[in-house]
Amino acid sequence: MEQKILVVDDARFARKVAIKSLNNGGFDNIVQATTAAEAKEVFLNENPDLVLLDITLPDNSDLTLLEWMISVRPDAKIIMTSAIAQDLIIEDSIKAGAKAFIAKPFMEKAFLEKIFEVLEAEDKQ
Protein backbone atom coordinates (compact mmCIF):
# COMPACT_ATOMS: atom_id res chain seq x y z
CA MET A 1 0.00 0.00 0.00
CA GLU A 2 1.08 3.54 -0.63
CA GLN A 3 0.63 4.89 2.91
CA LYS A 4 3.81 5.56 4.85
CA ILE A 5 3.72 4.40 8.47
CA LEU A 6 6.12 5.50 11.20
CA VAL A 7 6.64 2.92 13.96
CA VAL A 8 8.07 4.50 17.12
CA ASP A 9 9.12 2.03 19.81
CA ASP A 10 12.38 1.54 21.70
CA ALA A 11 11.78 -2.21 22.03
CA ARG A 12 13.28 -3.97 19.02
CA PHE A 13 10.97 -6.98 19.35
CA ALA A 14 7.86 -4.76 19.51
CA ARG A 15 8.97 -2.93 16.34
CA LYS A 16 9.62 -6.23 14.56
CA VAL A 17 6.18 -7.58 15.50
CA ALA A 18 4.43 -4.37 14.41
CA ILE A 19 6.33 -4.21 11.12
CA LYS A 20 5.69 -7.89 10.34
CA SER A 21 1.98 -7.39 11.04
CA LEU A 22 1.91 -4.26 8.87
CA ASN A 23 3.67 -6.14 6.06
CA ASN A 24 1.11 -8.94 6.37
CA GLY A 25 -1.61 -6.29 6.04
CA GLY A 26 -0.13 -5.02 2.79
CA PHE A 27 1.86 -2.08 4.15
CA ASP A 28 5.44 -1.94 2.94
CA ASN A 29 6.37 1.74 3.23
CA ILE A 30 7.44 1.71 6.87
CA VAL A 31 9.93 3.94 8.67
CA GLN A 32 11.14 3.50 12.24
CA ALA A 33 12.34 5.45 15.25
CA THR A 34 13.52 4.31 18.68
CA THR A 35 13.57 7.61 20.61
CA ALA A 36 11.45 10.75 20.77
CA ALA A 37 14.28 12.79 19.25
CA GLU A 38 14.61 10.38 16.32
CA ALA A 39 10.81 10.23 15.94
CA LYS A 40 10.61 14.02 15.64
CA GLU A 41 13.22 14.04 12.89
CA VAL A 42 11.56 11.20 10.96
CA PHE A 43 8.10 12.74 11.45
CA LEU A 44 9.27 16.05 9.96
CA ASN A 45 11.33 14.55 7.13
CA GLU A 46 9.12 11.64 6.09
CA ASN A 47 5.62 13.09 6.66
CA PRO A 48 4.03 9.72 7.51
CA ASP A 49 0.36 9.00 6.86
CA LEU A 50 0.09 7.17 10.19
CA VAL A 51 2.21 6.97 13.34
CA LEU A 52 2.26 4.04 15.77
CA LEU A 53 3.67 5.65 18.90
CA ASP A 54 4.72 3.80 22.03
CA ILE A 55 3.84 5.89 25.06
CA THR A 56 7.08 5.05 26.90
CA LEU A 57 10.38 5.89 25.24
CA PRO A 58 13.81 6.40 26.85
CA ASP A 59 13.63 10.16 26.32
CA ASN A 60 9.83 10.57 26.58
CA SER A 61 7.59 8.76 29.03
CA ASP A 62 4.32 10.63 28.74
CA LEU A 63 2.21 12.32 26.08
CA THR A 64 4.73 15.06 25.25
CA LEU A 65 5.75 13.58 21.89
CA LEU A 66 2.12 12.99 20.89
CA GLU A 67 1.27 16.58 21.80
CA TRP A 68 4.28 17.85 19.84
CA MET A 69 3.28 15.85 16.74
CA ILE A 70 -0.29 17.21 16.93
CA SER A 71 1.02 20.77 17.33
CA VAL A 72 3.17 20.36 14.21
CA ARG A 73 0.49 18.55 12.20
CA PRO A 74 -3.01 18.87 13.69
CA ASP A 75 -4.32 16.36 11.13
CA ALA A 76 -1.74 13.71 12.09
CA LYS A 77 -3.10 10.17 12.41
CA ILE A 78 -1.48 8.77 15.53
CA ILE A 79 -2.24 5.51 17.29
CA MET A 80 -0.74 5.15 20.75
CA THR A 81 0.60 1.77 21.82
CA SER A 82 1.53 0.52 25.27
CA ALA A 83 1.74 -2.59 27.38
CA ILE A 84 0.05 -0.50 30.09
CA ALA A 85 -3.58 -0.20 29.00
CA GLN A 86 -5.06 1.66 31.95
CA ASP A 87 -8.28 3.58 31.27
CA LEU A 88 -6.72 6.90 32.33
CA ILE A 89 -3.77 6.48 29.96
CA ILE A 90 -6.10 5.62 27.09
CA GLU A 91 -8.41 8.57 27.85
CA ASP A 92 -5.49 11.00 28.16
CA SER A 93 -4.04 9.77 24.85
CA ILE A 94 -7.32 10.31 23.01
CA LYS A 95 -7.81 13.74 24.63
CA ALA A 96 -4.29 14.72 23.54
CA GLY A 97 -5.09 13.89 19.91
CA ALA A 98 -4.46 10.19 19.36
CA LYS A 99 -6.98 8.56 17.03
CA ALA A 100 -6.83 5.23 18.86
CA PHE A 101 -4.96 3.17 21.44
CA ILE A 102 -3.65 -0.36 20.92
CA ALA A 103 -2.60 -2.42 23.94
CA LYS A 104 0.49 -4.62 23.62
CA PRO A 105 0.83 -7.46 23.08
CA PHE A 106 -1.75 -7.39 20.31
CA MET A 107 -3.32 -9.93 18.01
CA GLU A 108 -2.43 -9.22 14.39
CA LYS A 109 -6.03 -9.28 13.12
CA ALA A 110 -7.27 -6.76 15.71
CA PHE A 111 -4.14 -4.64 15.19
CA LEU A 112 -4.67 -4.41 11.43
CA GLU A 113 -8.39 -3.75 11.84
CA LYS A 114 -7.57 -0.73 14.02
CA ILE A 115 -4.98 0.51 11.50
CA PHE A 116 -7.46 0.29 8.61
CA GLU A 117 -10.23 1.82 10.75
CA VAL A 118 -8.13 4.90 11.56
CA LEU A 119 -6.86 5.32 7.99
CA GLU A 120 -10.33 4.91 6.46
CA ALA A 121 -12.14 7.10 9.01
CA GLU A 122 -9.72 9.93 8.45
CA ASP A 123 -9.91 9.61 4.66
CA LYS A 124 -13.71 10.00 4.75
CA GLN A 125 -13.55 13.37 6.51
Name these PLM-found stretches.
Residues 12-31:
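Two-component/phosphorelay signaling modules centered on CheY-like receiver
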Residues 58, 86:
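The feature encodes the CheY-like receiver
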Residues 41, 63-75:
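Short amphipathic alpha-helix used as the core "switch/output" element in two-component signaling
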Residues 35, 61-64:
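Acidic catalytic/metal-coordinating carboxylates
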Residues 88, 106-115:
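C-terminal output helix
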